[in-house]
């Protein structure tokens, strides 16, 4: 289909085709991820042409959220991979706030909370991404990941998405377990 996509003379039809291709590759990468086929998921998401992903805000946010939350990023070291995951999720959160997309605002916060649930990971990001963490309206202390997960829960309640609400509770539980505070 891509080989003959230049046959779409109408700009609106060409944009719709770009949207469909982007959606196809986003969904494909999710399926590969859930099948634990990480390389295939990366290949699928890398098939998305940046200008196509950037043309629709929802797709842009989903693209960056998937890359960060599913670890569909290229990196040479585990530390570099964690930083890239963080950057993708932070971009998702920041862009969602600016564009008023509460669903992705919550997803970005929940993804960041999951990355920082363990004390060692929190310290890692606290030293390497201080400027980003300072953008949130609460102290950057050991409770920071818990607060992020709780804010994500609030967003998902506003959005009334039961699946995401359950995921936020999992993130809160993950933090509490990692800190020996779960009873």
Regions found by a protein language model. Name each.
Residues 41, 82-85, 89, 145:
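Single-residue signature of alpha-solenoid repeat helices
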Residues 19, 58-60, 103, 143, ...:
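Residue signature of alpha-solenoid helical repeat architecture, marking inter-repeat boundaries
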Residues 2, 8-12, 32, 45, ...:
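Eukaryotic all-alpha helical interaction scaffolds
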Residues 23, 62-64, 69, 107, ...:
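Residue register of alpha-helical TPR repeats
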């Amino acid at each position: 289909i891509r080989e003959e996509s230049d046959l779409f003379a109408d700009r609106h039809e060409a944009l719709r085709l770009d949207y469909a291709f982007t959606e196809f590759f986003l969904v494909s990468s999710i399926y590969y991820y859930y099948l634990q086929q990480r390389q295939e998921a990366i290949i699928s998401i890398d098939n998305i042409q940046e200008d196509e992903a950037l043309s629709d805000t929802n797709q842009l946010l989903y693209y960056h959220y998937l890359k960060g939350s599913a670890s569909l990023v290229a990196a040479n070291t585990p530390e570099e991979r964690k930083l890239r995951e963080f950057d993708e999720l932070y971009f998702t959160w920041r862009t969602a706030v600016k564009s008023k997309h509460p669903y992705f605002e919550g997803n970005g916060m929940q993804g960041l909370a999951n990355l920082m649930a363990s004390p060692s990971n929190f310290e890692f990001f606290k030293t390497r991404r201080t400027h980003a963490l300072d953008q949130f309206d609460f102290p950057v202390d050991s409770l920071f990941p818990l607060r992020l997960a709780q804010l994500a829960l609030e967003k998902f309640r506003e959005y009334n998405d039961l699946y995401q609400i359950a995921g936020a509770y999992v993130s809160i539980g993950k933090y509490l377990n990692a800190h020996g505070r779960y009873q």
